[in-house]
């Protein structure tokens, strides 16, 4: 290795141009230019830079300089001045570099050459300004006419003549906004492999002799992503610090030569990014607001242990610059931005975001990062990044991530442009921007995503939009459902903790985890199935419909995954789901129906039969009875009549009674399903044997007769699904004959009936309006409909009686309305309608009695009193011969106060019916008496919640004895002995008690007494 004394001194005279025009503002920086050298062999007009003179030390050798020049890490930058380099995006300046073994000459100082060219500079200053302006406009117009950028491979030419550009040292260079790009593992990989850094200075054999130069390339700025990756390899461009910041770089002793580094160990860093970005030529410039400037990150030198040991440079020598890039890719530069694109992204304002808003955005970012992470895991790093960039939502929401560290956001003032109307247009515009350079993106997205820009702000502005939130949650849920847990036990514990939280979002997360466990780890749920079902069932009644809907769906997933293991939990879940079937929200009803269907399909059929019968058949809500009958019908079809009728006698009797109850329900759809199930049993031969073994009730015979006479509706279509057809009975002639289409308009019939048909049309509209009010969702509208029906019964009784079934199909549910005000008002109004309608109510009598009897157990005193008033009105106004079978058939299905009230009315009806038709009393009332005497205990109470019935049984037996006489004991002789004995004791004690009360209080023996405490045994 030679010494510095071996280097001969050389002196070169170089013209220096001083530009006196206006200089745009740039960041503040050091003012002293270090000596440098630029390749003089570059063609004029394409970036040939005139170097400043430099005196070479006597002891410097060209070989040392050449070895130091071979590595980019050896380049040293002193504090640059604020001049053309900062304005055009060039590095500040370079030291003089020795390239080859050519003789070196000393360069004169800039001060000695400034006076020689000052006179020429002043003369051409104004002329040059005008010429540059005209040529810049021409270049801008040519670029706008050629948006595609022209064919690749055409070299760029300066808009200033060669001599002028050489004198002014001005090379127009487009400089993009360099975003903060973090370090990546690829950079360290290149260092370890020892690869040469791309863009290094060529060897001496490639340069002309006698030249001291450094090539500055546009390759990094203009080549596309693929070529950039090939040219830069794994080089990571570090963040560019702001003013007054020191970049941590490998340092050396000031004044010494840069020591050669091993290949691949040089790390390129740079000063602050220029504030102007120029298009090709002297086109229009786009200024970047301060809020979008990249923030400094940790220097990549921290990853190099060897470099960390070196002392830091002083501030004046601390920042090397990017150099040694060739001009090869400059020929493939893209054309400048279009005018509308420049206007769109040029106008921006500063918006301050509060701390709470930033926290909400951070929460949103966490969800987005979780979604992207789930989608990126199965793929490699290269494929992962390309797919992330191709995703619409990930691309549009990239601008959210840098908001974590700052409280400001750059928001364009133009938000109604045409490119914001469609996401695809935005993506196409972003991808096809010709003047934007291709900058390699870090592979750690979206955590280190690019800053917010004009094309990524729609995601910010639509933050909290229901559409975005719903899509994101659905995608996240779908992504999680397909993936099993790495630790299922821990996932179950976390899910239960989330469900116990008071936050609805945590509850939703817990429910999604339960769905994942049910789909992928069903064996884990088996151990804690009861706890899981209990917690999930509790969320079905959540006031937030979103959580309730998700809980209902989760129950359906549990049924599908665990199947027969859910038998023990089916009853409680079925009650909860049936309760939700009466919800006003249709999507809740659909979800509950799907979960019930999943229960019927997966649990044991016998268990489904018991659950639906106990939870739905006896429910007060008609909608719940309807849906219970629907699913019960599906269960019966799967079991089959053969197996159902092969059970014990008690179970078969209970099943038949339940089906008869459904077949006589007030809701027409429930009646349809009930008759359908009875028809299934009737079609089997064992049903006849069942009828012979057990005495069929009057209700069963009536239902069977109706089925045989009318049959089941065709095509298994619900009556309500057929829609409300036009009432044909209203559109008839006066003589009852229907109107024929072939009848002439001038015929004698039609002329006489025009006024009548017009009045009938008004009646049809009136009935339609009445039906709409009775079935309205608002309780005030339903109360108004009940009032209109009462007025219509008073004013137009014939109209109501002619369409009684259609009217009462809408009115009967109001007698059991979920709203207490509507329920009580309907009962009170119906008590007033009964004397007006009288015998016309017989077709609807059974369904009305079922509904009214259920109200007798109401805890509301007003509803109970109104129901009792309806019973009394029916006994007084209706035909007792028709009323007796209906009331007697309901006693066995009643409990509580309803049994006492209905049995007390039976004792009254016996007195009026037996003289007219004794067979009716013997057939319907005597079985009720035997039932009471057979099941009553010694103290006169029935098992269950019915209470003490001694008083009503005594009145019933005395009423029967008064009208039947000794025939009552004759019928009792065929019953078990304890029944006969109990009846005799009851009659004797009643007669003695009545005589004693008549003697002591002066009350007639036949007066009604209730609440007697005498037991059934004799004294």
Swiss-Prot record:
A Pfam family the protein falls into: CLASP_N
Record's protein name: TOG array regulator of axonemal microtubules protein 2
A Gene Ontology BP annotation from the UniProt entry: negative regulation of cytoskeleton organization
Entry's family note: Belongs to the Crescerin family.
SUPFAM superfamilies: ARM repeat
Gene: TOGARAM2
Gene3D superfamilies linked: Leucine-rich Repeat Variant (1.25.10.10)
Biased composition (Polar residues): 1007-1019
Region listing for Disordered, in residue ranges: 28-54, 131-158, 249-311, 991-1019
Record GO cellular component, one term: cytoplasmic microtubule
Any GO MF annotation of the entry: microtubule binding
